[in-house]
Amino acid sequence: MISPQDLEGMSFEQALARLEQIVGELESGKAELERSIEIYEDGAALKAHCEKKLEAARLKVEKIVLGQGGAVSAEAAEFN
């Protein structure tokens, strides 16, 4: 089981790689029921962690704007 401390220390890429491993293991059908339940729970936690990291990254993205007189500024990017 992945602890909250382990999750906090994981980068997006690390969490995504582990999530892909879990999906592969579940799709193989070779894991016993208890193991499947355990890794499914880990997968759900990893998915939430990845979504949190993506949302934080999205909020950091800024759009560079060229204003009057050539002044450059940044403003929050709009995503639809």
UniProtKB/Swiss-Prot annotation:
It is an enzyme of class 3 (hydrolase). It is found in: Cytoplasm. GO terms for biological process: DNA catabolic process. Its main location: cytoplasm. It catalyses: Exonucleolytic cleavage in either 5'- to 3'- or 3'- to 5'-direction to yield nucleoside 5'-phosphates. GO terms for cellular component: cytosol; exodeoxyribonuclease VII complex. Its EC number is 3.1.11.6. Keywords: Cytoplasm, Exonuclease, Hydrolase, Nuclease. One of its GO terms (molecular function) is exodeoxyribonuclease VII activity. Belongs to the XseB family. Bidirectionally degrades single-stranded DNA into large acid-insoluble oligonucleotides, which are then degraded further into small acid-soluble oligonucleotides. Heterooligomer composed of large and small subunits. This is Exodeoxyribonuclease 7 small subunit. It comes from Caulobacter sp. (strain K31).
